[in-house]
UniProtKB/Swiss-Prot annotation, chains A, B:
Keywords: Aminoacyl-tRNA synthetase, ATP-binding, Cytoplasm, Ligase, Nucleotide-binding, Protein biosynthesis
Class of the enzyme per the UniProt entry, highest EC level: ligase
InterPro entries: aa-tRNA-synth_II, aa-tRNA-synth_II/BPL/LPL, Anticodon-bd, Anticodon-bd_dom_sf, His-tRNA-ligase, HisRS-like_core, HisRS/HisZ
Enzyme Commission numbers on file: 6.1.1.21
Stated name of the protein: Histidine--tRNA ligase
Catalytic activity line of the entry: tRNA(His) + L-histidine + ATP = L-histidyl-tRNA(His) + AMP + diphosphate + H(+)
One cellular component (GO) term of this entry: cytoplasm
Keyword presence, Membrane: no
Protein localization: Cytoplasm
Record-level Gene Ontology MF annotations: ATP binding; histidine-tRNA ligase activity
Any one Pfam family match given in the protein's UniProt record, by short name: tRNA-synt_His
Length: 438, 438
């Protein structure tokens, strides 16, 4: 053992890392989510981890803390990499991608993108510096049918339902409802109200009222009406009637209610309570122009959104002189997964993907053991051969420790049959490697 | 269309990005490689993209150019992230991982890791700043059976054989053969010779001879013997006899030849020429101590290694006071893939994963179309519904452009049958969504 200095490795705050059993569950989740996206025909896209800073900052000053890259051994006068930063979401890279590869794409372009993103935030509960997002977006030239505003929540519903996670609700709203309602009230800066209402679940109604009156300049009647609108919730088109009862009218409001009603209508076959219209959902981002989405855990809404998205009129406008409206939604995989791990709700899958451990009877019988393993692999079983001749008990112990369900015994003497032991039941039976079915 | 300034997006040199058809092939490759690794029971591991710099630099000054991270909006006096860098390979993070999670692992620990790595090199042919590596390693406490030195090339052989790539050879050597041979010749600094011989394929025999004599201080007889050894190649144990004929003897040489012979012997069932002992293979890295691997394309060996690896005695020694020998090999996915793309040998798969496009006969029949699509998805077919009522020709054209093989026609009138059109054959037949099989 060398006497060199030991660097005791420790976790890096905000950069999650899983032991193999936990990782095997994460991998199952990733496969499941991808399959859900592909089932609806979405194409896989990956973009580099970096973008030039101009692209990352193209939506104006961003509140996301960007990590920039610097070469450790860069020459003092070398500034060639000075303008690269790690992407902080997958939406900006996707907009850049669509503009850059416009002529190679078929529209409406439906893409999914499952990648890590980075934010130089102060790590705290549910906030990571490196985390995986699972995004789907549909983008089209000039016009994007409202049908997609309903398809995306349906996909998310199917995907999340297949994961073993606590109950959640996908809340839907429409920016036009908010904007039209506020304009119908005579409010001149609806976006300021949207930003204030977006904080409702964090800071409460009284604090929002204060902002609306003191900062956005609303009358107390206007503020009261805005908060009344935000209280409307429901999983069917009765929410449309509830808004109408507030007595505000404006063409944008009418358009928004029509859209919201149509989306709810197309989703009416989903289990009640899974997708709910919630007129308090605003999404702070400026670029949403219609439908907005936000999902939260029912038992911990304060944890914040686990999925979010919406419709935008022209996300790639800063990269290409084409009108490219779209609608997208993002599943915050790491946010969901890490919470369940830390709460002990995910305790892990199998340590390894091995289905069968083939016992090595002796060094002389290694090639026979390897041949059985090859045969089982050929037939679709993930198979290991124990790595050295050792007591059978020790070999079985290895399978137990690694969560391997079956131990295979090739003949220890010529002419004897193969046997296989099911470690869960303890049962051991004769078996033929050419026909055994697990 | 807004009049805002347009940021024309351009590729970032050294950061590959693929259009959807190319990406679909890459995804197939990634799935195939992963399946190959899992078939042999390797556990999935992912580590964060970053390590603290102390860890990245723990093997001493590295020739790999490291990218460090800096927060764009960092306060002048905030140095909390100053010590983070993107990993430049997956070996150092794996060594750190094993040390950090030692008590949660089962040994021998077999892990695969498929992730992006970053190097701040000057981009050139076959050299990227961001690329994907596919690594497998087996690591054990105190002792690692030689059997694994043969298992890894077998896995790589199976995996690469399943990809449609030009002919390649996986070359094997053993550091002990080189070291023992050099010591048997009376050379005092075998590592200097190993580093020189490692350049043989790049700079040629004469240049290596010059280095050996002028810089490593060898006599011309010693240099000649070293170069003679490097010429020995063969896919079976006859290479062992060929070395013996050179008349050098040393216990380390004998041990190395025994190991090399045993590994070749265990691999003797593989197709001739796929795994070859090549005594010129040295691998420059200091930490290899036995078997070394390096695969190259037969028609373009100058492109450099497409897989590489070897056996190491104590890779995690700087992180933990345990002896953890291992053996590993890495497939340079991006190096292989990007070369074939740039040479036009990979022209792309399907634009999207959709198997069936369901035609939308009219807005009134949307829910019937959605129901057929749901039924087909349930049965495992990736299915899209055309997004708006449009001329049938236009809907079929969309399927053609997106490489969707089947177009489904739900009844346009009540009581009529479903029909499905195979776009490859043009054949259109009646079909039942509950039993149709593609």
């Amino acid at each position: 053992m060398s006497e060199q200095r030991i660097i005791r490795p420790t976790p890096i705050s905000g950069f999650p890392e899983w032991t193999p059993r936990i990782r095997s569950v994460e991998l199952r989740w990733l496969d499941h989510i991808r399959r859900g996206f592909e089932r609806y025909g979405f194409s896989s896209v990956e973009t580099p981890s970096v973008e030039v800073l101009d692209v990352l900052l193209s939506k104006g000053e961003t509140s996301q803390e960007i990590y920039t890259l610097q070469r450790l051994q860069a020459d003092a006068d070398d500034s060639s990499d000075a303008r690269l930063g790690l992407h902080f979401d997958l939406t900006v890279p996707f907009a850049r991608y669509v503009a850059q590869h416009f002529n190679d794409l078929v529209f409406p372009f439906k893409r999914y993108q499952i990648q890590r993103v980075w934010r130089g935030e102060r790590p705290q509960e549910g906030r990571f510096r490196e985390f995986t997002q699972c995004d789907i977006d549909v983008i089209n030239v000039d016009r994007i049918p409202l049908h997609f505003d309903a398809e995306l929540p349906r996909i998310v519903h199917e995907v999340l339902t297949g994961l073993d996670i606590p109950a959640w609700t996908l809340n839907i709203n429409n920016r036009k409802v908010l904007q039209g309602f506020y304009e119908g009230l005579g409010i001149t800066d609806p976006l300021a109200v949207i930003r204030a209402v977006d904080k409702l679940h964090k800071i409460g109604a009284d604090a929002v009222r204060e902002i609306l009156i003191d900062q956005a300049g609303l009358s107390s009647d206007q503020a009261a009406a805005c908060l009344e609108l935000a209280e409307i919730r429901g999983s069917d088109t009765t929410v449309v009637d509830a808004v109408a009862k507030l007595g505000v009218s404006h063409p944008t409001l009418t358009a928004g209610l029509d859209e919201l009603g149509e989306v709810l209508d197309e989703l009416s076959d989903l289990p009640s309570g899974s997708v709910v219209a919630d007129l308090s959902i605003a999404r702070g981002l400026d670029y949403y122009t219609g439908t907005v989405y936000e999902a939260t855990f029912n038992d911990d809404p304060g944890y914040g959104s686990i999925c979010a998205g919406g419709r935008y009129e022209n996300l790639a406008g800063q990269f290409i002189r084409r009108s490219l409206p779209g609608v997208g939604i993002s599943i915050g995989l790491t946010r969901i997964f890490a919470k369940l791990v830390s709460e002990g709700r995910i305790t892990g899958g199998r340590f390894c993907p091995t289905d069968v451990l083939v016992v090595l009877p002796s060094d002389e019988r290694r090639s026979a053991a390897l041949a059985v393993a090859a045969q089982l692999r050929e037939r679709g079983f993930n198979t290991e051969v124990y790595h050295q001749a050792a007591k059978i008990g020790k070999q079985i112990q290895y399978a137990v420790k690694k969560d391997i369900p079956f131990v295979w015994f090739p003949p220890f003497d010529d002419g004897r049959p193969h046997e296989v032991k099911n470690l869960a039941t303890g049962e051991q039976v004769e078996a033929d490697p050419a026909s055994w079915n697990g």
